[in-house]
């Protein structure tokens, strides 16, 4: 098992230490052990979770929804985990539809300034 400090976890995930500490306060991450000095230690699963949470957040999923999923995972509550995953999948599907619609709109945009001026009322 790799043991990560907060700073090493942040470095390996490509985020700041402040983000890791914020996620700890929100319950998105939990240390698996503590040093004698009281510092949290994290494992590979924590690194994987941090990378997932960050990717989901960057995709537009709120930290509240991610915290609900993490709480369900930490409690080993299969029903709640499944429910939270379903919510996230619905969000992803809606986001895909919105992006597809945006792509259609972008394709219809005039590319030359003269075309744009002619299309204005």
UniProtKB/Swiss-Prot annotation:
The keyword Metal-binding does not apply. Transmembrane segments: none annotated. PANTHER family: HTH MERR-TYPE DOMAIN-CONTAINING PROTEIN, REDOX-CYCLING DRUG-SENSING TRANSCRIPTIONAL ACTIVATOR SOXR. It comes from Serratia marcescens. Keywords: DNA-binding, Mercuric resistance, Plasmid, Transcription, Transcription regulation. NCBIfam families: coreg_MerD (NF033783), MerD (TIGR02054). Signal peptide: none annotated. This is HTH-type transcriptional regulator MerD. InterPro entries: DNA-bd_dom_put_sf, MerD, MerR-type_HTH_dom, MerR_fam. SMART domains: HTH_MERR. The lineage of its organism: Bacteria, Pseudomonadati, Pseudomonadota, Gammaproteobacteria, Enterobacterales. Pfam families: MerR_1. One of its GO terms (biological process) is negative regulation of DNA-templated transcription.
């Amino acid at each position: 098992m790799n043991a990560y400090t907060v700073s090493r976890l942040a470095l390996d995930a490509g985020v700041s230490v402040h983000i890791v500490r914020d996620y700890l306060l929100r319950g998105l991450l939990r240390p698996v052990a503590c040093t004698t000095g009281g510092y949290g230690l994290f494992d590979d699963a924590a690194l994987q979770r941090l990378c997932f949470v960050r990717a989901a957040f960057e995709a537009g999923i709120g930290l509240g929804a991610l915290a609900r999923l993490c709480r369900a995972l930490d409690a080993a509550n299969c029903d709640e985990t499944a429910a939270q995953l379903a919510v996230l999948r619905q969000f992803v599907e809606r986001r895909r539809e919105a992006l597809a619609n945006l792509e259609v709109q972008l394709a219809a945009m005039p590319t030359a300034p003269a075309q744009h001026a002619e299309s204005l009322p």
